[in-house]
Amino acid sequence: MNQTELLHVNFPHLRDLKPFDTAHSATPWLADSEAKHSRKLCASIEEAVKRSGVQDGMTISFHHAFREGDRVINTVVALLARMGFKNLTLASSSLMTCNDALIEHIESGVITRIYTSGMRGRLADAISHGLMDEPVQIHSHGGRVKLLQDGELNIDVAFLGVPCSDEFGNANGTHGKSCCGSLGYAMVDAHFARKVVLLTEELVPFPNMPASLVQDQVDYIVQVESVGDPAKISVGAARVTSNPRELMIARYAADVIEHSGYFKPGFSMQTGSGAAATACTRFMEEKMERSGVKARFALGGITGSLVDLHEKGLIEKLLDTQCFDGQAAASLARNPNHVEISTNVYANPGSKAASCDQLDVVILSALEIDVDFNVNVITGSDGVMRGASGGHCDVAAAANLTIVVAPLLRSRIPTVVKRVTTRLTPGESIDVLVTDHGIAVNPARPEIRERLMEAGLKIVDINALYERAISLTGVPKPIEFTDKIVGVIRYRDGSVIDTVRQVKEEV
């Protein structure tokens, strides 16, 4: 009887212990000089798919740090289609106009379920008109992490595009020819996925530091020609505006912040996406310089405008879950107080602490806002999905002051409505609406209204804004829907706050 067998006899609770075999019995790759370092490398995406064990019915995930420049999602799904896979759940952190190619793979049954923060373009139009049998699950950035945490969403294989990686899988978005900046979305997928496949443009020597995605999270690595075009990050919702009306609204929003009571040394802010929201930053600069007020941190999607304020000493730290332009990506690489954070750290309501809980002020956009301050950023005036939840309801719930910026009308279509088509963020989370026709304050915040009126700002009742909009456009014709549900709007805690129904075809 050997030593291990004696242990089994004398200590029954140790019966699972095994006798020593060889130094490399559990790590055979260490006995192979080539496999020791290159065992994760795959010659093609197809090889990585096979090694990762993708099967019909599984869930695959992607990140959208490259936004409209992404080349990974379409490439991988097209390959999976050619390989014959069916009934897959697509769990991308978001989908863009560039993902219209997915339509054919939904029609053919390759993709049968989708979890995403949002969608745009022909893909969104097709789904809004009933393309899928299963409704799309629309979640917030923080809410996505909670779905993963709670086990409703389980990623089998994550395909994550990165500019550079070493042969063990240490990767970041701040080096290489196609820098996208923060990999805050991908960090979550790398943590939760059963298998992680990196698609990288460049293989660099070990160790590739700093690493956003680390070697103990990564299973396989494929070098590809391109994962994305960083020049297309700052288009669409992340574009920079020169529109006079949007700039005027941005200036009004900066005035609201200045006189809100929260504009004081050490305040914190997030400026969100949307042209007027991001433009607000440039107007905050002059107010901060004039008053000597410096911010403790800015959070969320980071823009070049926020980087300018940081480098001028007006914002102490930048907490970055997504870079909205090349200037922000470059800053993340060189500025030690420009810090990358995951969407879990950013806004997960189920985490032990979400950074958004520390926010004083947030500026957000809206497709519609109703007289009860409920906000829609998902569906357009035609009922078609054309936006994203993003971090909207996350930061609106957490910030001390939530400001929505929007024009009163868009192409003669009212933004202020009686009731939003789709409710994403509840009115109880919205404090102020800033439009080109005046500023409305939620009645639940009388102290804010009083401060703004004392400052001489144009304060109006939100019902008056609605009446003004209707007087200019008339009452819009109601959108006709069928009974089929094509989208489920999940609040950040996972609950259902609304649904999207199929748009009825015109006869």
Can you name each region flagged by the protein language model?
Residues 1-507:
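Conserved alpha/beta enzyme-core scaffold
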